[in-house]
Amino acid sequence: MPKTLHLAEQLIARPSLTPDDAGCQQIIAERLAPLGFSCETITSGPADFRVTNLWAKRAAAPVKSAQHTTKLVVFAGHTDIVPSGPVQQWRCHPFTPTQFDGKLYGRGAADMKTSLAAFVVAVEEFLTAQPDTALAIGFLLTSDEEGPALDGTVKVCEALQARGERIDYCIVGEPTSLERTGDMIKNGRRGTLSARLTVKGVQGHIAYPHLAKNPIHLVAPALAELVGVEWDRGNAFFPPTSWQISNIHSGTGASNVIPGAVVIDFNFRFSTESTPESLQTRLAAVLERHELDYELAWTLGGTPFLTEPGTLVDAVVDAIKQETGLTTVLSTTGGTSDGRFIARICPQVIEFGPPNASIHKIDEHINVADIEPLTNIYRRVLENLSAGLSA
């Protein structure tokens, strides 16, 4: 059995529901230690939500001359998975990795345990061929990416920053491809800014509206205006910033009572053309103009990041072309990832992994034919980066 497939099956068999790593990181650490990696477990979070993080690093070989330098490339990812959903609806048990019709089924097969396995095997192959590389290699893994993401990658990044650790390049193994492995990579992500808006009125009998103030009616014109705002026009790398309402809560449950308040949850997905502060200011101005009695609580989930074409992007694009013949598409679409935390301490961050059509679904799977190319691409990226150091 191919090494990556075998390791992927070992990881899929572990029911690592957030925040339980279920031993996945130990399996990986045991593969990395013989290669010269120092492996450190960093735990965080309250007693009832204990998160396991792994930081593993192999130092570069000493440089031969002043003209040469060393760089640190980090593979980042998560060992945690989302719940399987109804087990009886699966083709196989979600934690019994099963091959059928050319596909490997199991929770985490695409998101993202196969990427983790491919990371490890790619590094094994690369270091076997180039044990004296000037490229330092790291692994940053967490069991808190699919959950609140408060005690995972962000905590490791804070610890590394406090130590003065410099990361030059980072590849996050998120499933970014669409139809074939390598057809799309993410060279950035939009920021996410959420808020809960509470608009106050006066509760009363629905037959006597003159004795009450309906907060839903009061806020409706403001919402209509906000829906029509052009927050920005995006740019060459990002689509325009979007504003979307996710939830509206109001009422007592009775059909004859005007509610006393309405609570509205909304979210911005914003480009580098806007800032959290500018969006907050502009939205508050609309609410003030409509003379609403309101409270607003903001939560910044992450700021946008962008890695423009350069050393890392070029190394990945070239590796994909070498392995698959595909000309990959650079994209910043989709949701957030832990790349937003890593970008704070690393100037070049990209995300690349297998097709994502089945992630978080019943019968999550990856095409077996995609597994070896994924491993080879990761290895070729290391080769490209290493070659650049000795050129």
Swiss-Prot record:
Its EC number is 3.5.1.18. Pathway: Amino-acid biosynthesis; L-lysine biosynthesis via DAP pathway; LL-2,6-diaminopimelate from (S)-tetrahydrodipicolinate (succinylase route): step 3/3. Pfam families: M20_dimer (PF07687), Peptidase_M20 (PF01546). The keyword Hydrolase applies. Transmembrane segments: none annotated. Binds 2 Zn(2+) or Co(2+) ions per subunit. InterPro entries: Bact_exopeptidase_dim_dom, DapE_proteobac, Peptidase_M20, Peptidase_M20_dimer, Peptidase_M20A. It catalyses: N-succinyl-(2S,6S)-2,6-diaminopimelate + H2O = (2S,6S)-2,6-diaminopimelate + succinate. Zn(2+) 1 binds at H78, D111, E174. Keywords: Amino-acid biosynthesis, Cobalt, Diaminopimelate biosynthesis, Hydrolase, Lysine biosynthesis, Metal-binding, Zinc. Gene3D superfamilies: Zn peptidases. The active site is at D80, E145. Zn(2+) 2 binds at D111, E146, H360. GO terms for biological process: diaminopimelate biosynthetic process; L-arginine biosynthetic process; lysine biosynthetic process via diaminopimelate. GO terms for molecular function: acetylornithine deacetylase activity; cobalt ion binding; succinyl-diaminopimelate desuccinylase activity; zinc ion binding. Its cofactor is Zn(2+); Co(2+). Homodimer. Belongs to the peptidase M20A family. DapE subfamily. Catalyzes the hydrolysis of N-succinyl-L,L-diaminopimelic acid (SDAP), forming succinate and LL-2,6-diaminopimelate (DAP), an intermediate involved in the bacterial biosynthesis of lysine and meso-diaminopimelic acid, an essential component of bacterial cell walls. This is Succinyl-diaminopimelate desuccinylase. It comes from Albidiferax ferrireducens (strain ATCC BAA-621 / DSM 15236 / T118).
